[in-house]
């Protein structure tokens, strides 16, 4: 196969990535699926991921204008998560990496009872252990370069340590979790002539937005 790939922007993130949302999470999921399929098919003699490095394309209107973002490295040669994933699958040099190094400050609106998020550790070792704030989350088998852990995040600092033999990696994630707060807003300003047509002002249309209380 000549090429496949998906663009990503290290400033955008999602726990539920979707097509063309330009999150590193979608780029990883897209390429992971293609690589898994290619590895299953003996009739393919080779394939290539497009591209190694983000590059300029005048007139392109993605999340970063004039840039093709399908690279495994940013335009200034910083490694994306897909780079570490491919390294874990294909490199013989021992390595370990906790995914999410460009998503260390997270804000969420959620129920207090929901505090578990999945974290991937990329490695070419057989097993890895993940430690969260000093407590081991167990040892997982590495499958296709990746081990997935359910991490019980807390508000504030979350320190993650991944270990496999002499290899280790550390990632600090600052989490700000808040319950949703609703704000009702009128669509029409006070002096809008359309407003005069409504006899009962309490019936004015409104919409709901969900604000994030950062403090």
Which positions does each model-derived feature cover?
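Beta-strand-rich structural segments
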Residues: 117-123, 202-215
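Glycine-centered loop-to-beta-strand initiation motif
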Residues: 145-147
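Residue-level signal for glycine
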Residues: 134, 169-171, 213-215
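Extended substrate-binding grooves/exosites of carbohydrate-active enzymes
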Residues: 1-141, 150-153, 159-165
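A residue-level signal for beta-strand positions that form part of recognition/binding surfaces
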Residues: 95, 182, 204
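Compositionally biased low-complexity segments at domain edges in trafficked proteins
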Residues: 186-211
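Edge beta-strands of extracellular beta-sandwich domains
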Residues: 166-187
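Terminal or standalone catalytic/regulatory effector modules within metabolic enzymes
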Residues: 158, 174-177, 190-193
């Amino acid at each position: 196969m000549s090429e496949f790939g998906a663009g990503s922007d290290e400033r955008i993130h999602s726990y539920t990535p979707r097509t063309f949302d330009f999150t590193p999470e979608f780029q990883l999921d897209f390429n992971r699926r293609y690589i898994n399929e290619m590895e299953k098919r003996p009739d393919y003699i080779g394939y290539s991921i497009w591209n190694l490095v983000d590059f300029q394309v005048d007139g392109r209107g993605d999340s970063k204008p004039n840039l093709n973002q399908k690279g495994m490295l940013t335009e200034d040669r910083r490694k994306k998560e897909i780079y570490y994933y491919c390294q874990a699958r294909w490199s013989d040099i021992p390595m370990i990496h906790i995914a999410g190094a460009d998503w260390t400050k997270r804000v969420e609106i959620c129920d207090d009872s929901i505090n578990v998020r999945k974290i991937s550790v990329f490695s070419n070792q057989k097993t890895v252990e993940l430690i969260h704030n000093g407590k081991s989350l167990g040892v997982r088998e590495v499958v296709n370069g990746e081990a997935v852990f359910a991490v019980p995040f807390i508000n504030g600092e979350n320190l993650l340590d991944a270990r496999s033999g002499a290899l280790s990696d550390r990632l600090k994630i600052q989490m700000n979790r808040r319950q949703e707060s609703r704000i009702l807003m009128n669509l029409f300003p006070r002096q809008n002539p359309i407003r005069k047509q409504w006899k009962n002002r309490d019936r004015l249309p409104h919409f709901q937005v969900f604000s994030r209380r950062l403090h």
